[in-house]
């Protein structure tokens, strides 16, 4: 009896980018705000600064100059559990998209706040 291989999951469409400020909606860190350090679209997870802290036990390795001990670091959380914080209204909001026409007949899609309409993309 052959074991069927699982297909790799399709990448998840995540509207968050690195350096965005987000607010955690669920879990043990509910209500905390932090900066996005990394986005993994393959697994649908984001790494948020000072959120979901775990203790990592590390063995010393003198060859690689790694000091042993218990290190505290962030763990990834599901992107559906966070919302972006608007810099204008300072609230956790959903993201809308506006299409702006630029020179040469091209269009650029920008992320905007659904509550106040301010652009969320950095210049």
Swiss-Prot record:
HAMAP family: Ribosomal_uL24_B. This is Large ribosomal subunit protein uL24. One of two assembly initiator proteins, it binds directly to the 5'-end of the 23S rRNA, where it nucleates assembly of the 50S subunit. The keyword Transferase does not apply. Belongs to the universal ribosomal protein uL24 family. InterPro entries: KOW (IPR005824), Rib_uL2_dom2 (IPR014722), Ribosomal_uL24 (IPR003256), Ribosomal_uL24_CS (IPR005825), Ribosomal_uL24_KOW (IPR041988), Translation_prot_SH3-like_sf (IPR008991). One of its GO terms (cellular component) is ribonucleoprotein complex. Keywords: Ribonucleoprotein, Ribosomal protein, RNA-binding, rRNA-binding. One of its GO terms (molecular function) is rRNA binding. The lineage of its organism: Bacteria, Pseudomonadati, Acidobacteriota, Terriglobia, Bryobacterales. Part of the 50S ribosomal subunit. GO terms for biological process: translation.
